[in-house]
Structure formats: C-alpha cells, structure tokens
Amino acid sequence: LSKTAKFSNGKWKIENLNKLLLYCSNFEIANIGKCKFELYNYQKTAVKELLDIDEGSLIVASCGAGKTLIAIDLYLELLSRFKIKGPGLIVVKSSLKVQWYHEVLKFSDLTPSIIETTAKAKKKFDSQFTGDLLICNYETLNDDLVRERLLNMNIDYVFADEVQYVKNYAAKRSKSLYKFNKIKYTFGATATPIQKNPRDIFGIYRFIKKDIFTNINTFDKRYVKKNNLGFIIGSRNERELTDKIRDNLIIRTKDEVSSHLPKLIVTQKYCNLGPKIQKISDQLLEEIKELKSMQEAMMDRFNTIEEARLNKEFTDLDNQILMKQAFAQEITITDELLSYSDSVAAKQYVTGEKSEKIELFLDLVESIISEGDKVCVFSKFRSLQDILIAHLQKRFKNIEIAQVHGGLSSEQRYNEVQKFSSQKTCNILLSSGAGNEGINLSTAKYMIEMEPADSYLVQTQRHGRIERASSIHDTAFVYQLIANNSY
C-alpha cells in the first residue's frame, strides 16, 4: 500500500488502482487473460491499464517482460469486447517477423500471416493478407501497394514492437507507419527509454497519438534546447512534456517485474595478453595516441569540428584512428580476427600467438556443459563465430553449436534458437549483435560476453536474452571476459 496509496486520518487513500493491483499479486483480475498461457500479474495489469486508457499508448517494459504476450492478449481482449472487428497489424524489425509468427501460434488460436513486399510476395501477394494478426517489418510499409492494401482493410489495431525505430520523424519508415495513426488503437512497445533527444518523443507519439503535438516547429520551441549553432543539446519544460504523454503511457520497471525474472549474477573474468600480443597492443595504442595528437594540432586551422570533418586530411586521420581502434579491440580476443580481415593493414599485426582469452572461454564452456547446462556466447565480431567453432570442435568431440548472425534469414535464426532451446545435445549458441534483441534464450543458464558491450544499452539488451520471465532458472550467470592492460 505504501507504494500506491497515502495513509491519512486513519485511512488508506488509493492513488493508483492499477499500481495496487500490480503489487498485490493475490488480487484476482477478472476477465483478463485470453491467451493459452496464464499471464503474470504485471502483464494482466498492463492489459487492464491499456483497456482503461482505451486509445493509443506507449508501453515501456524491461527486456524479458513478455511484451509479445501483452500485445496478443490485448488484441484478444479488444476483440472480445467488440472494440475492434477485423485483423490486427503487428509491425516489427525484419529479424523478428518469424519469431512473432511462431509466438502468435504458441500463445493463441489466432492465425498469423507474414506480409512481404510486392516484389518478394509475387504470386502469393493476395493470400498473405488473410489471417487474424498480420505481421510485417517497418520497411515493408514503404511498399505503396502493401500499405494501401492494409489501409483499405480498415484495420482497427496496430502494435509496433521496438517502436523506437520511428523516433526519427523524418525517416521514410516513420512516415509510412504514420499513415496508420488515424486508427484508434495504435500501440508501441519498447525496452529502450527515451534518452537524450526529446524529439524522439515527438517521433514516437506521431504514430501513437498524433494530436498530442501539433507540429515539429511548435514542439521544438517548447521542449527542445539548442546551442547557438542550432544543434540539439537537451530538453526544456520536461515536467510539462511528461504531463502531455502521461495519459497515453504505461511503464513496467525492472523492479516491478523482477520477482518473475531470474536473479542475474554478472562476473568479470580476467586474463592476460600473451607477450607478443601485448607488445602489438601497446604499439597500436601508441599509434592511436599519435594520430589523435596530429588531429588536435590540426584543429587550430578550423573554427568547429564540423568544419574540420570537411577536410580530407582530417577525415583520413579519423579513418586511421577508427581502423586501429578496431584492430586493438580484436586482438584482446585473438589476433586470428585480424587474419580474417579484408584489410591488408591488419595483417602486419598478426603474431600467431595463442589467445589466453580463447583458452579462458574454452575452460568456462567445459565447466558449463559438463553440468548439462546451456550457454549463449555474444560478440559483435561476426567472424569470431567461425574461429570459436574451430576451437570448440577441436576441444570437444561431436559438439552441436547453434548460431545467430546477420547473414541468416529470420526463419533460419528462429530455427537456430529453437535447436538450442529444445535439443538436449545443443548446449552452445553463438550470437553476433543480430541476437541482441528479440530472441528468447530462457533455457540458457549462462552467458559469456567475449568483449565488453559498446554501451550500457547493448549490455542490457544482451542480458535480457536470459533474464526473462519465462526463464526455467532461478539464477542466471553472465561472464564478461576482459583482457588486462588492453584497449
């Protein structure tokens, strides 16, 4: 009660009934839950809250909170209450279409259908518009024939997953989605909170509830802070902006769903670089430092960094710095990555020395799979998967390995995840950044990060693959592999 009400004159005054229901899991929420699977209390209260709002809304929920289940049940609830009549539209990232298709089948008796562009669909163009929940990616809506066909179907329900993809109001995919903003029930879901640029709110709500903000010029004058050069540096009137969207926003924080998530234990595992690789690492860091000094000396010739970036000599130095930074990152794992590189410059830094981090990785995998547990392995370097597979096959006989990367189709990725999740003999899944979002690895007890994530957001997305409400484990473990004295 203390979280949702105030005590005054001997009585509790409830300020937010939905929050009270959220924290009181023993309260029965009647007539909510039309899916095959029982919804958690925080999911039921989310659906109830959205039904009470009774128009477009933004759903912010942590990774693993089960936004897919909320979307499907919300559609069923609106259908059962005769608020909507026909099919609904689910808009997702391209890599998640197949995942959504199978989850609709898993969680309901609805018929899903994936919509492709005119060129891809060809002869089956008409048949793909039959179904209860139509699924397409954002870019598919750029296809004039697809978009017009959907608009003419008088769809009453649109749910945009990873809705931060339309935060740039001027992008083509954003404008295509905005064509559907006259529909009453337009929902967007994200695990990524709005961060620095207040215009993100304008872009997202242009789809969810177009009348909240009249136009971008008025929005900028009231809520956007710019410097003398016209660059956005922050926001203004934040409280007023929050109040504007409050009635069309529901949030489920990690604390609110944590009782349904496994406890996540993150541990750093350190190793040293071999002497030859350490020497190369030091050399690269020194070369990067020297290039940056050259850039700083050049800045006296320019008034702004933007002006400097128009200078070829300056941008050449920029490119060299980025290239050497990439090399410095790669050798913290193994200089075999440099051997795989198309860059001729990379080859001069190859030592052929055994990687201490690869050895640490193999030892961790051995201890994990010897207990019969599953582990997912993340790295932003796609070519590392081939290297790790070679080492794993050398260490372990008849080992089965699943892979997720950008070179696979949505169907192939889904099949790889299913193989890892359902087959007892497949205990290892290797993933590039393509697996940071949208895949459910609830059977994995362990995660290994071969290098630190580039940002806290990427790290949160990675961890969200195993920190899920559907996890079969009470505790999940993340090992972050870090090389001492390296980039």
How should each PLM-predicted stretch be described?
Residues E55-L74:
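Walker A/P-loop
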Residues I135-T140, R147-N154, K172-I183, I212-A346, ...:
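Inter-lobe coupling linker of SF2 helicases/translocases
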